Amino acid sequence: MTMKSGTQYEGKARKELQEWDIFSVGLQPDASPDLIIPKYNIGIEVKSTRLNKFYPSKNSEQYEYLKNKFSEDWPGYSAYYMIYFIKSHSWEVFPIASKSPFKVGKGISVYDFIQEIILTPEIVYISTENKNGGKK
């Protein structure tokens, strides 16, 4: 696994995002990709940027649909990631909660989430900071 971290890769990451047409998806509408998986054309994020033009607005029908679908598919969970799969042109939602089926504990990190859902070593790691201030 190749792991790249720190600000020296930030410019490169933004360029690659444009080239791959990967856009931000996730917990917050203003989030930017923190992990990029070229093989699957997926971007996962935990920090803010303007790369969110395809993220469903909180007032949109798409957002409401996904939120309701998540509640039905994952009852009892409150936090989730939204991921847009470019090749299939579809949104999917996955839970992050204390009862997470992907990891025992108080939730799931972005890195663990990707490992469990995608099961691939082809991860380009862009940022070392997460919402808890520690390293992933």
Language-model segments: residues:
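Beta-rich catalytic cores
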Residues: 31
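A short local loop/turn or secondary-structure capping micro-motif enriched for an aromatic residue
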Residues: 51-54, 101-103
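Short, charged, amphipathic alpha-helix that recurs within catalytic cores of restriction-modification
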Residues: 54-82
